[in-house]
Amino acid sequence: MLTQVLFEHPLNEKMRTWLRIEFLIQQLSVNLPVADHAGALHFFRNIADLLDVFERGEVRTELLKELERQQRKLQAWIEVPGVDQDRIEALRTELKNAGSILISAPRIGQFLREDRLIALVRQRLSIPGGCCSFDLPTLHIWLHMPQAMRDAQIETWLASLSPLNHALTLVLDLIRNSVPFRKQTSLNGFYQDNGEDADLLRLQLPLDSQLYPQISGHKSRFAIRFMPLDSENGLVPERLDFELACC
C-alpha cells in the first residue's frame, strides 16, 4: 500500500518543459486503445497540448545539450576508483546513440502537425463542445472504422515521438537518480535551502499527513511551504519530517 507521495518541482524552464512533455506522452498511452469519443478527445487533446509545448521552445537543442552534459558527467565518474566502468560506458554509448537518433530525426512534432485528422481536431478543441459529430464528421467516421485501423494509425503517430521520448527518458532517469533522498525537517510548515545549481526538486511526504508542498525558487535557492489538503480544518505540525533530493 502506498505510504509516501512523491512531488517533483522544476527549478528552471527547460526542466519545466521536459516534465510537461513527459507527462503528456505518458497520458497518450493511458486510455489506449481509443475505442470511443471520450477516449479520442483525451488522446487528441494531449496531442494538441504536446504540439503547443513543442512550439514554445527549442526542445531538441536543449535535450541534445543535456545528453552531451550527461556524457561528460559519466566520463568524470570513470576515473573514480571502484565504479562499474562497464555500466558507465554502456550508459555513455546509450546517450550518444540517443543523441545521434534525435539529431537526425525530422523536426519534433512535424509528422503530427501535418496529419489532417489531428489538425482538424486540434482546431476545434478550443471551442466548447466543438468536437460534436456535426462539427467533426471526420472524427465521427474515424471512430467507426475498424479498431485495428485506428490502432495502427495511433501506433504510427506515437512512433514519430520515439526519438524524443527515448532521449528524454534517459536524461530524466539520470537526473532523478543523481542524488539520493535525504531526511529534512520543516519548522512551522516552512523550509528553505540553497539549490546548488539543481534542475529538479524531488520531495516525499507521508500520505497520512494529508499535506502538500507549495514550492518556489530557482536553481540557486528555493523555499517550500507545506499546506493542508483540508484548508479549513487541516493542521501543519510544528516539525515535519520529509525526504528531499535536489537533483
From Swiss-Prot:
Pfam families: ZapD. Belongs to the ZapD family. InterPro entries: ZapD (IPR009777), ZapD_C (IPR027462), ZapD_sf (IPR036268). NCBIfam families: PRK05287.1-1, PRK05287.1-3. Cell division factor that enhances FtsZ-ring assembly. Directly interacts with FtsZ and promotes bundling of FtsZ protofilaments, with a reduction in FtsZ GTPase activity. One of its GO terms (cellular component) is cytoplasm. Its main location: cytoplasm. Interacts with FtsZ. Gene3D superfamilies: YacF-like, YacF-like domains. It is found in: Cytoplasm. It comes from Escherichia fergusonii (strain ATCC 35469 / DSM 13698 / CCUG 18766 / IAM 14443 / JCM 21226 / LMG 7866 / NBRC 102419 / NCTC 12128 / CDC 0568-73). The keyword Cell cycle applies. It comes from the Bacteria. The keyword Cell cycle applies. Keywords: Cell cycle, Cell division, Cytoplasm, Septation. This is Cell division protein ZapD. GO terms for biological process: division septum assembly; FtsZ-dependent cytokinesis.
